[in-house]
C-alpha cells in the first residue's frame, strides 16, 4: 500500500466522551472523513473499526490520488501511543509522516496552531505517542479549547461544549479540514501559514 502518512485524531472512546472538549481531535478526524466522503464517496475505505486499539481508514484523494491513513485510537487518551505505534509499525510510517490532531488548553476556542516536533505542552496523548514511537518529530494540529475560569482542568476538558459554542466549533472543524488538506497537498510550511493565521469568531 502506497501511503503518504498517518493522520491521528486524539480523544477518548465511548458515548460518555462524545463531543467533549478533550475529544476535539476525534471530532476533526470525523469531519475530515465526512468531507472526503461528501466530495468523493468511494475514496474512504475502512481498514477496521471497533478493533481493540483503534479505528482506521484509508483516505485516497487528499493529495490528488495518493493515500493517507486516518486513525482514532480506542485506547483512551493516556495510551494513544499504543495504537499509533502499532499502526506505524505495521504500515512502516516514520514519525515525521504523522499528523496528530489534539485539543489545546493554551489556545482559546477559535484559534489553532500547526507545530512540528518540539515540546509536548503537558498533553498526555502526545506524551504517549512520543514514548511509544520513540520520537517527538511528528506534526501536531493544536485545536484551542481555552482554559477553565476555576482552574478545574479535568472537569473542563471532559465537559461538553456549550450550546453557545457549537457554531464556533463547526467553523473550527471546517477550517481544520482545510488545514489538513493544505498540509497533505503542500506540506508543513503552507499548513503553518494557513492554520496559524486562523482567528475564528
From Swiss-Prot:
Entry keyword set: Cytoplasm, Hydrolase, RNA-binding, tRNA-binding
EC number: 3.1.1.29
GO biological process, one term: protein quality control for misfolded or incompletely synthesized proteins
An example Gene Ontology molecular-function term: peptidyl-tRNA hydrolase activity
Compartments (UniProt record): Cytoplasm
Residues with site note (Stabilizes the basic form of H active site to accept a proton): 103
Residue(s) at site: Discriminates between blocked and unblocked aminoacyl-tRNA: 12
Catalyzed reaction equations: an N-acyl-L-alpha-aminoacyl-tRNA + H2O = an N-acyl-L-amino acid + a tRNA + H(+)
Gene3D superfamilies hit by this protein: Peptidyl-tRNA hydrolase (3.40.50.1470)
A Pfam family recorded for this sequence: Pept_tRNA_hydro
InterPro entries: Pept_tRNA_hydro, Pept_tRNA_hydro_CS, Pept_tRNA_hydro_sf
Database matches in SUPFAM superfamilies: Peptidyl-tRNA hydrolase-like
GO cellular component: cytoplasm
Active site per the UniProt annotation: 22
Ligand binding (tRNA): 17, 76, 78, 124
Subunit annotation: Monomer.
Function: Hydrolyzes ribosome-free peptidyl-tRNAs (with 1 or more amino acids incorporated), which drop off the ribosome during protein synthesis, or as a result of ribosome stalling. Catalyzes the release of premature peptidyl moieties from peptidyl-tRNA molecules trapped in stalled 50S ribosomal subunits, and thus maintains levels of free tRNAs and 50S ribosomes.
HAMAP family hit by this protein: Pept_tRNA_hydro_bact
Similarity comment text for this entry: Belongs to the PTH family.
Protein name in the entry: Peptidyl-tRNA hydrolase
Organism expressing this protein natively: Oleidesulfovibrio alaskensis (strain ATCC BAA-1058 / DSM 17464 / G20)
Source species taxonomy: Bacteria, Pseudomonadati, Thermodesulfobacteriota, Desulfovibrionia, Desulfovibrionales
Amino acid at each position: 500500500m502506497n501511503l503518504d502518512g498517518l493522520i491521528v485524531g486524539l480523544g477518548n472512546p465511548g458515548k460518555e466522551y462524545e463531543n467533549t472538549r478533550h475529544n476535539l481531535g476525534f471530532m476533526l478526524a470525523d469531519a475530515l472523513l465526512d468531507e472526503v466522503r461528501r466530495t468523493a464517496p468511494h475514496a474512504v475505505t475502512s481498514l477496521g473499526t471497533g478493533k481493540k486499539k483503534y479505528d482506521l481508514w484509508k483516505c485516497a484523494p487528499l493529495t490528488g490520488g495518493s493515500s493517507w491513513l486516518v486513525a482514532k485510537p480506542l485506547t483512551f487518551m493516556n495510551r494513544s501511543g499504543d495504537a499509533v505505534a502499532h499502526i506505524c509499525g505495521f504500515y512502516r510510517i516514520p514519525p515525521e509522516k504523522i499528523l496528530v490532531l489534539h485539543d489545546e488548553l493554551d489556545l482559546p476556542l477559535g484559534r489553532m496552531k500547526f507545530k512540528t516536533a518540539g515540546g509536548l505542552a503537558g498533553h498526555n496523548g502526545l506524551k504517549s505517542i512520543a514514548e511509544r514511537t520513540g520520537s517527538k518529530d511528528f506534526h501536531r494540529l493544536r485545536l484551542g479549547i481555552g482554559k477553565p475560569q476555576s482552574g478545574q482542568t479535568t472537569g473542563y476538558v471532559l465537559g461538553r461544549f456549550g450550546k453557545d459554542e457549537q457554531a464556533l466549533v463547526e467553523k473550527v472543524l471546517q477550517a481544520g479540514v482545510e488545514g489538513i488538506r493544505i498540509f497533505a497537498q503542500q506540506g508543513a510550511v503552507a499548513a503553518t501559514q494557513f492554520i496559524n493565521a486562523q482567528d475564528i469568531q
